[in-house]
């Protein structure tokens, strides 16, 4: 398990959000999912509310909804995941990001220490 980066905030549902609006899932979440085989990403331009299911990550074990950690508009998606969904496992905090949001309001988010405490 990698160290939880402190440069972002976390939702209790295991998504992370950076200051520039990039969203992904935590290392803890990708470990629980197992090998990711498919990622269904939201449409660019979609308006979402914090806590709304906006994407799906499918693994060999299960499919899991991904929730928006903040309200806003989807501005970009990580198109590389369509051909390489394993990036979610290999690099959950960098190359495995899912989508970007133009944030209008953050949801109920935790700092890294609080997230680690509740995730373990």
Curated annotation (Swiss-Prot):
SUPFAM superfamilies associated with the record: Single hybrid motif (SSF51230)
Sites of N6-lipoyllysine modification: 61
Record-linked CDD domains: GCS_H
Lipoyl-binding domain segment(s): 20-102
Top-level taxon: Bacteria
Pfam families registered for this protein in UniProt: GCV_H
Cofactor note: Binds 1 lipoyl cofactor covalently.
GO BP: glycine decarboxylation via glycine cleavage system
UniProtKB keywords: Lipoyl
Cofactor(s) the record lists: (R)-lipoate
Gene Ontology cellular component list: cytosol; glycine cleavage complex
UniProt entry tagged with the keyword Acetylation: no
Family that this chain belongs to: Belongs to the GcvH family.
HAMAP family registered for this protein in UniProt: GcvH
Subunit (UniProt): The glycine cleavage system is composed of four proteins: P, T, L and H.
Function summary: The glycine cleavage system catalyzes the degradation of glycine. The H protein shuttles the methylamine group of glycine from the P protein to the T protein.
Full protein name: Glycine cleavage system H protein
Natural source organism: Deinococcus radiodurans (strain ATCC 13939 / DSM 20539 / JCM 16871 / CCUG 27074 / LMG 4051 / NBRC 15346 / NCIMB 9279 / VKM B-1422 / R1)
Gene behind the chain: gcvH
């Amino acid at each position: 398990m990698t160290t939880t980066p402190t440069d972002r905030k976390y939702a209790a549902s295991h998504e992370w959000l950076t200051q520039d609006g990039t969203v992904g899932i935590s290392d803890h979440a990708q470990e629980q999912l197992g090998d990711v085989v498919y990622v269904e990403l939201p449409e660019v331009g979609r308006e979402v509310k914090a806590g709304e299911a906006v994407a799906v990550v499918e693994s060999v074990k299960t499919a899991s909804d991904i929730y928006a950690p903040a309200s806003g508009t989807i501005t970009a998606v990580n198109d590389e995941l369509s051909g390489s969904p394993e990036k979610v496992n290999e690099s959950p905090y960098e190359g495995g990001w899912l989508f970007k949001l133009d944030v209008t309001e953050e949801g109920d988010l935790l700092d890294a220490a609080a997230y680690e405490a509740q995730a373990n």
